[in-house]
């Protein structure tokens, strides 16, 4: 017991309420260095606690003797504690250096206590003496300290229990007793639920918005310590007591977003552990259109730290390209990719998502050949091989292989493809440009191209399952790998068909297995090289035809079944069947677009689709004369722009309506094309042509203003406005067919072109306004100059004579090729569109060179 008294007297301090009252109540918490004892003084020994803390190292050694009986007293109060104490001291007394050990123990505990005391005092002076204003005061006043000053003192010291992490001498009891206050400034725990909440928040895995700043002790100990260091400007609780701390006053932070973690990618990269506490959320998730990245869902699919691998700034890897290593060729565009309405996450099922795939444009564009800002609209559905970025693969194809199909997709030849297709006019107007450069050489499809671009098995309208055509490997390895996208216009079905993803997607060694190395597709569409489909058939065409936008000769044939294949508009991968061919093939163009199309804007896609449906497999039946190249409808020299992808207005139910790629309208008197061949409404097309920039959607209106062209009315010799209108009414229904047939007739063959030119000289406007490179241009110009547009009725009459056109029906379309000039009046008659739209580049207006210019630029 000497040991007890000796060290024990110091220790006898157990009576010293601080340690041993604790011992009484909490003595069950024991630690070798008595640290157990000291901390639990909740019993009421706050006074003793104060004395102990107030004394320098151990006053107990000085006056501890007076309390030397404490073991007895302790036994009275807490027999168990006394037993432990005796056992401990007795053991110490038997140690060789008992005095020194005991002294050392006490000193260590004293140092801990002293430090604790100093910290307590400092904090108390800072937090309590300044009489914290506002919330702090209200809390203190609201909370009558239940345990009295002792508890208050204890709790104030509790924040010191930060030292639990530094000085592990606290007893478990204390931890349990004041677990929360430990992290906050002095106030009784129980009465401050907010503290518990904050403590929970501090300890909680969900980090506050200030998370990037590692919590510091001072800040942790203060009520709003977790807040970023800012001046706290609230009237209450101005945190004056922070002055003593090195923590500057700070403003309370906004609620941390549970979804957007505050950590930067750099932090994540360096401290991967930080991400564990953060919700797995990132802006990476591709909008549903792209959601294909890994699981085909738009949910949080990748840990945010995957951003860092993406070369897209801000971690906005909307394309999921970080996983899509094959798409690096499109990388440059990723940074200026645009959130177009079709991409919008809000329109998950956007029907255009497939029609206008969001393939990055800029990377592969030849800026010189790209006539509008790359992000201006959807990429040409035909001209660009587009990986699907959609998670809802079912949209495009029923047999979506797996969400992996997107990630595996690679676009090796993407740039070359884009080059060939983007230079709209340079390329043969063939929408399918062979990746092996055939398109550049103008060696368009020779022989009956079997452009069964996966879904686009033209001859049989039914969809050819690419898996049948391509096999299930990387598109049947037998297919020559030389041509990646043999044609820009491979249908979405091909790109997106299940087997497409299976093989790793974009690396279609040869999208069309049937394509032989030469790119000669030899089995699908029954187009002769002589057909308008083959560019060579175009009279004015040479492999490098003029660099202005070709307006008319090619049309995209959307395999009708393919169009809506996934239930959404598939890309219209038109094989650029010339519009004339389409016209030749269309059985009853009237049944197709009700919107009258001007001669310059043949609804070729619809017509071709129609013809494909009806007579795709067979030779075109509607050629005015089989001998004349079907293409004649558009003098190939006339840069007729490809038909609207959406083609038929009211026609083929399978064909989605033509939609403006800029404003997404489906109603326009005249369909135009952007440099890439994508359909633009008249307004957007004109705007682009005139201003060189994409028409802002803010200008979009639902009202189509019709302009009375006095010039057109005057030009129409002997035709009164009313007569025009009446004829217009009559012809409007058939307008598409009319323009088509007339065009077919007029440009049906180079001879017809010649005829048209001569006619033009006679003052009749050839319908194909674009002057062929040969005489027709001059003829056209002359014709325009002397545009004597016969009234529609006259036109019709003239048409009637021309029996060559099978569709002659009363519609003007049956104008004979020579009557091309007469047909031209028809174009104005196409009235609603033509007259309404100056943009109607129909020579209907007959406005001289300006119209020629319009013709040249019409595809815009």
Curated annotation (Swiss-Prot):
Cellular compartment(s): Nucleus
Keyword presence, Transport: no
Record region (Disordered): 1-24, 116-159, 174-193, 559-600, 612-658, 706-850
Transmembrane segments: none
Chain intervals with Basic residues compositional bias: 1-14
Stretches with biased composition (Low complexity): 747-758, 766-791, 813-840
Any Gene Ontology CC annotation: nucleus
Chief site of localization: nucleus
InterPro entries: AreA_GATA, AreA_N, Transcription_factor_GATA, Znf_GATA, Znf_NHR/GATA
GO molecular function terms noted in the UniProt entry: DNA-binding transcription factor activity, RNA polymerase II-specific; RNA polymerase II cis-regulatory region sequence-specific DNA binding; zinc ion binding
PROSITE patterns assigned to the protein according to its UniProt record, in alphabetical order: GATA_ZN_FINGER_1 (PS00344), GATA_ZN_FINGER_2 (PS50114)
Keyword DNA-binding recorded: yes
Compositionally biased tracts (Polar residues): 122-144, 577-587, 710-719, 732-746
Described function: Major nitrogen regulatory protein.
Protein name: Nitrogen regulatory protein areA
UniProt source species: Penicillium roqueforti
Encoding gene (name): AREA
């Amino acid at each position: 017991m000497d040991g007890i008294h000796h060290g024990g007297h110091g220790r006898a301090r157990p009576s010293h309420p601080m340690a041993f009252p604790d011992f009484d109540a909490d003595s069950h918490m024991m630690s070798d260095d008595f640290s157990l004892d000291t901390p639990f003084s909740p019993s009421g020994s706050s006074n003793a606690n104060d004395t102990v803390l107030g004394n320098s190292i151990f006053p107990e050694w000085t006056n501890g003797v007076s309390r030397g009986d404490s073991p007895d007293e302790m036994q009275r109060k807490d027999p168990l504690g006394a037993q432990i104490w005796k056992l401990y001291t007795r053991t110490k007394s038997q140690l060789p250096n008992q005095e020194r050990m005991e002294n050392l123990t006490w000193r260590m505990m004293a140092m801990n206590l002293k430090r604790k005391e100093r910290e307590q005092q400092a904090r108390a002076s800072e937090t309590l003496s300044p009489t914290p204003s506002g919330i702090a005061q209200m809390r203190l006043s609201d909370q009558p300290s239940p345990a009295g000053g002792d508890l208050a003192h204890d709790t104030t010291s509790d924040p010191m229990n930060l030292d639990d992490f530094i000085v592990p001498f606290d007893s478990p009891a204390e931890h349990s007793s004041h677990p929360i206050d430990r992290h906050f400034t002095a106030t009784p725990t129980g009465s401050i639920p907010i503290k518990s909440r904050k403590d929970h928040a501090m300890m909680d895995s969900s980090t506050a918005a200030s998370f990037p700043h590692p919590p510091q002790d001072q800040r942790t100990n203060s009520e709003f310590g977790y807040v970023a260091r800012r001046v706290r400007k609230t009237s209450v609780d101005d945190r004056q007591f922070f002055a003593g701390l090195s923590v500057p006053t700070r403003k309370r932070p906004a609620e941390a977003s549970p979804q957007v973690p505050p950590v930067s990618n750099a932090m994540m990269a360096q401290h991967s552990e930080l991400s564990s506490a953060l919700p797995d959320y990132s802006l990476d998730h591709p909008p549903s259109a792209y959601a294909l990245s890994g699981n085909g869902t738009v949910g949080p699919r990748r840990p945010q730290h995957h951003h860092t691998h993406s070369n897209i700034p801000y971690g906005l890897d909307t394309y999921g390209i970080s996983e899509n290593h094959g798409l690096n060729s499109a990388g440059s565009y990723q940074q200026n990719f645009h959130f177009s309405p079709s991409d919008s996450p809000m329109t998950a099922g956007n029907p255009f998502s497939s029609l206008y795939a969001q393939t990055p444009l800029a990377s592969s564009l030849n800026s010189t050949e790209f006539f509008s800002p790359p992000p201006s609209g959807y990429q040409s559905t035909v001209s660009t091989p587009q990986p699907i970025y959609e998670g809802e693969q079912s949209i495009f194809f029923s047999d979506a292989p797996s969400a992996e199909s997107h990630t595996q997709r690679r676009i090796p030849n993407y740039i070359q493809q884009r080059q060939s297709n983007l230079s709209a006019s340079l390329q043969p107007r063939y929408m399918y440009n062979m990746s092996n450069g055939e398109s550049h050489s103008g060696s368009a499809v020779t022989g009956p191209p079997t452009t069964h671009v996966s879904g686009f098995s033209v001859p049989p309208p039914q969809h050819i399952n690419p898996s049948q055509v391509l096999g299930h490997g990387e598109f049947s390895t037998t297919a020559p790998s030389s041509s990646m996208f043999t044609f820009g216009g491979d249908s979405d079905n091909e790109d997106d068909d299940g087997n497409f993803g299976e093989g790793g997607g974009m690396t279609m060694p040869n999208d069309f297995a049937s394509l032989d190395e030469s790119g000669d597709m030899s089995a699908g569409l029954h187009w002769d090289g002589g057909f308008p489909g083959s560019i060579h058939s175009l009279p004015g065409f040479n492999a490098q035809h003029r660099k202005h936008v070709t307006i008319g000769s090619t049309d995209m044939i959307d395999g009708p079944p393919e169009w809506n294949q996934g239930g959404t508009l598939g890309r219209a991968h038109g094989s650029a069947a010339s519009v004339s061919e389409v016209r030749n093939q269309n059985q009853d163009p009237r049944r197709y677009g009700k919107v009258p199309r001007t001669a310059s804007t043949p609804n070729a896609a619809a017509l071709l689709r129609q013809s494909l449906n009806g007579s795709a497999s067979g030779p075109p039946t509607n050629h005015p004369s089989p001998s004349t190249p079907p293409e004649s409808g558009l003098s190939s020299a006339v840069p007729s722009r490809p038909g609207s992808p959406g083609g038929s207005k009211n026609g083929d139910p399978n064909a989605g309506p033509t939609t403006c790629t800029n404003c997404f309208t489906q109603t326009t008197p005249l369909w135009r094309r952007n440099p890439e061949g994508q359909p633009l409404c008249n307004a957007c097309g004109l705007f682009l042509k005139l201003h060189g920039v994409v028409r802002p959607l803010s200008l979009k209106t639902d009202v189509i203003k019709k302009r009375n062209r006095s010039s057109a009315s005057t030009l129409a010799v002997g035709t009164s406005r009313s007569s025009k209108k009446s004829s217009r009414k009559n012809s409007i229904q058939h307008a598409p067919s009319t323009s088509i047939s007339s065009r077919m007739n007029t440009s049906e063959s180079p001879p017809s072109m010649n005829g048209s030119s001569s006619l033009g000289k006679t003052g009749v406007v050839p319908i194909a306004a674009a002057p062929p490179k040969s005489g027709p241009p001059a003829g056209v110009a002359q014709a325009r100059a002397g545009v004597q547009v016969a009234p529609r009725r006259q036109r019709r009459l003239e048409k009637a004579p021309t029996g060559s056109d099978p569709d002659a029906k009363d519609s003007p379309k049956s104008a004979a090729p020579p009557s091309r000039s007469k047909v031209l009046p028809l174009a104005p008659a196409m009235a609603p569109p033509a007259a309404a739209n100056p943009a109607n580049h129909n020579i209907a207006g007959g406005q001289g060179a300006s119209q020629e210019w319009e013709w040249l630029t019409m595809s815009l």
